[in-house]
Amino acid sequence: MPRKSVLDFAKGRGAYVWITAYDYPTAKAVDEAGVDGILVGDSLGMVLLGLPNTLGVTMEDMVRHTEAVARARPRALVVADMPFMSYETGPEDALRNAARLVKAGADAVKLEGGTEYAPIVERLVKAGIPVMGHIGLTPQRFLTIGGFKMVGKTEEQRRKILEDAKALRDAGVFSIVLEFVPASLAREVTQAVDVPTICIGSGPHCDGQILVLHDVVGLTERPPSFAKKYADVAAAIREAVSKYAEEVRKGLFPAREHYRE
């Protein structure tokens, strides 16, 4: 099947399935599972590197992991996160950094923020770089929103998120992630814009869903309440490594078929 492009994402084409991946083998696996989009998320800082938040993720981190995912040559669309302070300093810095991610193999970039970053989105789109928006809970701004909690419960917040969605739409995003907002607000935003909305922790009314792979397969110690675990890979790893350790200590591995004289 041909690789997907941003033109394949539009309203009314079913529910889009997105998931994160950060390296070659997981990108290959999730693509073979049939997802529509792969996000090389700055969440890698927390789920891979053990950081307490995403603020410490660098452009070098994002370029390296985007390259790894792109080497899997996935059919799915590959979107790379723009990390903290890679675009906030102005349109030209944003363009330079977004171009690095595209050269690393991303089909598009994602950036957090609403109306205030619409000019940056517009600059990137005019330069030929597709952009996915991200509003609601924006993890790079957890210090200013009081932590990792639901956003959009007050009338002021709801109005701001709606304004943000429309501003991003007008700036040219091809899609918008809505993170951890009330389902009723996600439905309102989805009805208000003509680009696909992708929910994470925001209910069933968006045009698609996205989750962090490590939450889905059971590799996260404390997954968010809105995630669902579909497998327990951590338990499988513990079991496999325990058996390996036991066989080494008992002299059962390597067996004759595992080596040559």
Swiss-Prot record:
It is an enzyme of class 2 (transferase). The keyword Magnesium applies. It is found in: Cytoplasm. Mg(2+) binds at D42, D81, E112. Disulfide bonds: none annotated. Pathway: Cofactor biosynthesis; coenzyme A biosynthesis. 3-methyl-2-oxobutanoate binds at D42, S43, D81, K110. Keywords: Coenzyme A biosynthesis, Cytoplasm, Magnesium, Metal-binding, Transferase. One of its GO terms (biological process) is coenzyme A biosynthetic process. Binds 1 Mg(2+) ion per subunit. InterPro entries: Pantoate_hydroxy_MeTrfase, Pyrv/PenolPyrv_kinase-like_dom, Pyrv_kinase-like_dom_sf. Homodecamer; pentamer of dimers. Belongs to the PanB family. NCBIfam families: panB, PRK00311.1. This is 3-methyl-2-oxobutanoate hydroxymethyltransferase.
